[in-house]
């Protein structure tokens, strides 16, 4: 049995330590800066020059292969100067798409402003009426983003981590400033199982001194105690993470210096005649040499294998002995992820019924308290679950390296005999559905809290789709999988059904449809096709549920509609969108803000996946009122595909002619022909 546990752990560990690179379908919007100090009119010369400049920067002939270009249009006082800088690891095609996307959004985000900076994950676009070329700007327009987590609650460890990051990034800044592309990446060992990754870049038109000064300003402005941070100025960018967020193979490395010439042969004290082929003993001699070489090589390989097994066994002992005090710490390395089963057993009072707080995707969930007072949620795999083993591995592989304030944190896991256990941070307010759909608790969620929940879920999906080093499709986004912390901040949970997409992959097909009926996109539910747009659809359903305070499945014939989407669409087309709003918040919300969110929700649930906005666009719509929203098309109505149900309990499955499916608040684990 111990060998089986070792194998399972090594299998998981091999996934945990592998590196992935995400690719985004659309550029990931970060921020924009457009001070209203100077403006221009629509029909002015400056407006014409600006459009000429933007057209030039986004033309087919722009320098996307180098990732940098500047341009000027017009004459003073209406001259416009602009540039773009693409991240050093992106391809020319990605660079071009990012610049074009940014140009298309420019006049919406910053209308009639004479200078602006637009930050995207893959590029920066900038223009001004001032001369911005060959000039480092470090006094305005910065964008700062930091992970909320620190490496450890121990201050000594935090100080050590901060010092390491500071010295590493400062050294990298000097190397970036000295390079021809003004670019340098970091990939250095932090611990035995954790590397530190970084990327520093300046616009290539800066001098060495200006580039170094700009990057050092970025480093000094970052919260280096966090496990990830970035600070972008209009002229330079600096970022570090504990995962490989860039494509290292796409960044050119300087060629190795040529090998030194071989030393001249030393003169021998005894003259040795040259050996000719005629002096060799023949085939038997060659065979002897070959046999000896093979034997020596085999012995060396055997010794290496024995040494590797010894080290692996020695290291595994450290994995099996995680103590209760270690459990409370932030788990920054893989060796602290596997927890001692007895510690978990004690924390949950031997999985007492009184400690049970719910049921997850593949087992029951318990509240646990470790000896240091740390409260945790413990998910225990059901031994009778067909899909539990696969979902357990998926959840560990996916969640272990994800670090975001809107994703639930995995603190560890345990493999003990048949036991499969996941340990998460504890969420005192349970899940969104517990508050949103409970008539006695709905009053706790005012409009501002609901709006914050919508924005937090969007940020979490953004991270999964585009900002993580993995591209992850959740496939089961629903109210019961959105947990709420003590401050009602949302955290996406339950990744047992998630799929990891490879480089440049945008969609996939499956014959095993998993998820929750009512939240699943039509193309996925009917044909098994899933993509980022499938999660966008689920997000749209969530938005409409949060605004209305009603489940998608809570409608009956008396409502004149059989689901929430039908109801919302009818109200929208009849120009009665505000009738959708939960009466508990109707009097204390901004009508324009609520209607805009309903509009966004309907855009997300459109039947055609191509018409649904990418989550980066959704986030931009939520955070900027200057973005114009397109007219929504009719949503995908699952109701047309649903057969008449037999009278079932609320936790049973409904049956259609072609396959069984579950109702809205229960997850499907398998769909198959009857």
Swiss-Prot record:
GO biological process, one term: response to reactive oxygen species
UniProt superkingdom: Eukaryota
Enzyme Commission number(s): 2.7.11.-
Cytoplasmic face of the membrane: 311-674
Catalytic site: 476 (proton acceptor)
Stretches assigned to the Gnk2-homologous domain: 28-132, 139-245
Any one GO molecular-function label of the UniProt entry: ATP binding
Residue intervals on the Extracellular side: 25-289
Residues recorded with modification Phosphotyrosine: 424, 524
Chain positions carrying an annotated carbohydrate: 36, 43, 61, 70, 104, 178, 247, 286
Biased composition (Polar residues): 650-659
Pfam families: CR_prot_dom_plant, PK_Tyr_Ser-Thr, Stress-antifung
Keywords from the UniProt entry: ATP-binding, Glycoprotein, Kinase, Membrane, Nucleotide-binding, Phosphoprotein, Receptor, Repeat, Serine/threonine-protein kinase, Signal, Transferase, Transmembrane, Transmembrane helix
UniProt name for this protein: Cysteine-rich receptor-like protein kinase 6
């Amino acid at each position: 049995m111990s060998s089986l546990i070792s194998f399972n752990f090594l299998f998981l560990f091999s996934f945990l330590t592998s590196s992935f690179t995400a690719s985004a379908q659309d550029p990931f919007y970060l921020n924009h800066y457009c001070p209203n100090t100077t403006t221009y009119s629509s029909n002015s010369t400056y407006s014409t020059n600006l459009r000429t400049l933007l057209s030039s920067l986004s033309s087919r002939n722009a320098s996307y292969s180098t990732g940098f270009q500047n341009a000027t249009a017009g004459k003073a006082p209406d001259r416009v100067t602009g540039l773009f800088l693409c991240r050093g690891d992106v391809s020319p095609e990605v660079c071009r798409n990012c610049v074009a996307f940014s140009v298309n959004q420019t006049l919406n985000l910053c209308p009639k402003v004479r200078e602006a900076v637009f930050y995207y994950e893959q590029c920066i676009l900038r223009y001004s009426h001032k001369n911005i070329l060959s000039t480092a700007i470090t006094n305005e327009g910065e964008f700062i983003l930091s992970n909320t987590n620190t490496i450890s609650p121990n201050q000594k460890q935090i100080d050590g981590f901060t010092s390491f990051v500071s010295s590493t990034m400062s050294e990298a800044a000097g190397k970036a400033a000295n390079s021809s592309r003004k670019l340098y990446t970091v990939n250095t060992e932090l611990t035995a199982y954790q590397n530190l990754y970084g990327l520093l870049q300046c616009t290539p038109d800066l001098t060495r001194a200006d580039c170094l000064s700009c990057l050092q300003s970025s480093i000094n402005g970052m919260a280096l105690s966090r496990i990830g941070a970035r600070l972008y100025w209009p002229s330079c960018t600096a970022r570090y993470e504990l995962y490989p967020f860039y494509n290292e193979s796409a960044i050119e490395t300087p060629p190795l210096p040529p090998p030194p010439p071989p030393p001249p042969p030393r003169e021998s004290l005894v003259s040795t005649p040259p050996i000719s082929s005629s002096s060799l003993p023949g085939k038997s001699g060659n065979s002897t040499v070959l046999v000896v070489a093979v034997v020596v090589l085999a012995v060396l390989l055997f010794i290496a294998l024995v040494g590797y097994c010894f080290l692996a066994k020695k290291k595994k002992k450290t994995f099996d002995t995680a103590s209760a005090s270690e459990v409370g710490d932030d788990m920054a390395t893989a060796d602290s992820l596997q927890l001692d089963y007895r510690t978990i057993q004690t924390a949950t009072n031997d999985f007492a019924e009184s400690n049970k707080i719910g049921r997850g995707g593949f087992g029951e969930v318990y509240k646990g308290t470790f000896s240091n007072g740390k409260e945790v949620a413990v998910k225990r795999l059901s031994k009778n679950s067909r899909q539990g083993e696969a979902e357990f591995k998926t959840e560990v592989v996916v969640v272990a390296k994800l670090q975001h304030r809107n994703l639930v944190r995995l603190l560890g896991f345990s493999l003990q005999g048949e036991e499969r256990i996941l340990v998460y941070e504890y969420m005192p307010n349970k899940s969104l559905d517990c508050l949103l759909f409970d008539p006695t608790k709905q009053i706790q969620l005012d409009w501002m809290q609901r709006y914050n929940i919508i924005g937090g879920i969007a940020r979490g999906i953004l991270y999964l789709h585009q900002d993580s080093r993995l591209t992850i499709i959740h496939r089961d986004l629903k109210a019961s999988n959105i947990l709420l912390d003590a401050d009602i901040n949302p955290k996406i949970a339950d990744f047992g059904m998630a799929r990891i997409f490879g480089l440049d992959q945008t969609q996939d097909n499956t014959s095993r449809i998993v998820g929750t009926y009512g939240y699943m996109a039509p193309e996925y539910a009917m044909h098994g096709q899933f993509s980022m747009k499938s999660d966008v659809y689920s997000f749209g359903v969530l938005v409409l549920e949060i605004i209305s305070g009603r489940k998608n499945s809570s409608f009956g014939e008396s409502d004149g509609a059989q689901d929430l989407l039908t109801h919302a669409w009818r109200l929208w087309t009849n120009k009665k969108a505000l009738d959708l709003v939960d009466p508990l918040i109707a009097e204390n919300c901004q009508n324009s803000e609520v209607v805009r969110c309903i509009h966004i929700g309907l855009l997300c649930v459109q039947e055609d996946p191509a018409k649904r906005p990418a989550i980066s666009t959704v986030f931009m719509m939520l955070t900027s009122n200057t973005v114009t929203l397109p007219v929504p098309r009719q949503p995908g109505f699952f109701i047309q595909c649903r057969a008449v149900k037999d009278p079932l309990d609320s936790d049973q499955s409904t049956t259609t002619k072609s396959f069984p499916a579950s109702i809205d608040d229960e997850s499907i684990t398998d769909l198959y022909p009857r």
